[in-house]
Amino acid sequence: MASSQLEFNVERKQPELLGPAEPTPYELKELSDIDDQDGVRLFLTAIFIYPPPTKTSMPTRKTDPASDIRRGLSKAMVYYYPFAGRIREGPNRKLSVDCTGEGIVFCEADADIRLDGLGDVEVLRPPYPFIDKMTLGEGSAILGAPLVYVQVTRFACGGFIITGRFNHVMADAPGFTMFMKAAADLARGATVPMPLPVWERERYRSRVPPRVTFAHHEYMHVDDPPPRPTSEPWSLHSAFFTKADVATLRAQLPADLRKAATSFDIITACMWRCRVSALQYGPDEVVRLIVAVNSRTKFDPPLTGYYGNGLMLPAAVTEAGKLVGSDLGYAVELVREAKGKVTEEYVRSAADFLVLNGRVHFVVSNTFLVSDLRRLIDLANMDWGWGKAVSGGPVDVGENVISFLATSKNSAGEEGAVVPFCLPDSALGRFTSEVKKLVCFRPLENAAASNPDHGYMSRM
């Protein structure tokens, strides 16, 4: 039965404050100047979907997943103890975490259906029409409130879903996943999490005095027009690219790019170009692509175990007419140039820029922001002792301009990249047509395969 047609109930137990399993330091820790920018002062939600355990994955002890997850989270907070604290704001809007050990919010719940009643769990992807029942509604206050809200929903078949809402100023998606994986490992009996978490927020703080050494177009308005007034709602959809789709797109590139471009470069360039065309910008309008780049590997030595905000936002800027009127290779080159900007010096320069400019939000007007979470969110190793997650990742895109690549499967069982994105309904047909041209009439799937009332039904 399709999830959109299915009525079911979820009974929640009383949410509780879950603290660290052992005493933790009581201290005030200053966040980085990347952590407290306006663009991350919000909550994000992640979902992890687990099928019923098999004979090989079933724990030998008599327990249930919620109790194992509860225990693992409590143990993980001994190492990631700032997550058990509360955010405070000081002079000049500077944020710190007060490590009070108060804990996170944890809730058990039970659904009165089988997990497969939601659809094929391996192909579930945003938008999730059932997400409100799986997620705690609290979690809008950035200051003085719990930093993490976890709900474990058990299904009649033995499968379960974990959702985690977390305060983005404390961690990015890879950082929160690191915390959840540590909890899963500890629940299974690990003595310490690997890698061990590191704080090191000073690596992402501004210098004294600040000195901006790059043009940070991600935060700078470059001949931007005022936002277009519109009352039309934007809807969330998901595109799916198989390896064959990527190969088809790659074949359209110049020889040097065919060898050098990654699948992220190609998919992002395709999505950006088609999106700009679908939104019908004027040919002289400035459009911007922001690429989220993991900066942890840009330090020497790399910041292994860093769970703060480490995704930098370098931008490419061009005119809409030039982007749409050029071949795909032009867009791919811009993606690669943006990615290549990020170095340790770039990180310092970005922190300096943010401090000098009031911790501004990244530019939203005429912008498309994309991150690659396929390797940064390790579902294959997210095992609490009941088997591995088969799908999951961020629940939504947060803002209309944001998108990401995540690993998924289509209804035929092919692995590929799912790309959630937002568009006004009036632009969706044009977007579909543009992608159709580039992938040579190969199908572009959307969430309609499992969530027909939220996706678009067009087949290319």
From Swiss-Prot:
One Pfam family name is: Transferase
**Reactions the enzyme catalyzes:** piperidine + (E,E)-piperoyl-CoA = piperine + CoA + H(+)
Q: Which residues form the active site?
A: 168 (proton acceptor), 383 (proton acceptor)
Q: Name one GO biological process term.
A: piperine biosynthetic process
Spell out the GO cellular component terms annotated for this protein, sorted alphabetically and separated by semicolons: cytoplasm
* InterPro entries per record: CAT-like_dom_sf (IPR023213), Plant_acyltransferase (IPR050898)
Tell me the route in metabolism or biology where this protein functions.
Aromatic compound metabolism
Question: What GO molecular-function term can you cite, just one?
Answer: piperidine N-piperoyltransferase activity
Q: Where in the cell is it found?
A: Cytoplasm
Enzyme Commission code(s) on record: 2.3.1.-, 2.3.1.145
- Ranges in a coiled coil: none
* Biological role stated in the UniProt entry: Involved in the biosynthesis of aromatic piperamides natural products such as piperine (1-piperoyl-piperidine), the pungent principle contributing, together with several terpenoids, to the aromatic properties of black pepper fruits, and displaying numerous pharmacological activities such as antiproliferative, antitumor, antiangiogenesis, antioxidant, antidiabetic, antiobesity, cardioprotective, antimicrobial, antiaging, and immunomodulatory effects.
Family listed: Belongs to the plant acyltransferase family.
Assembly, in brief, is: Monomer.
What is the name of the protein in this document? Piperamide synthase
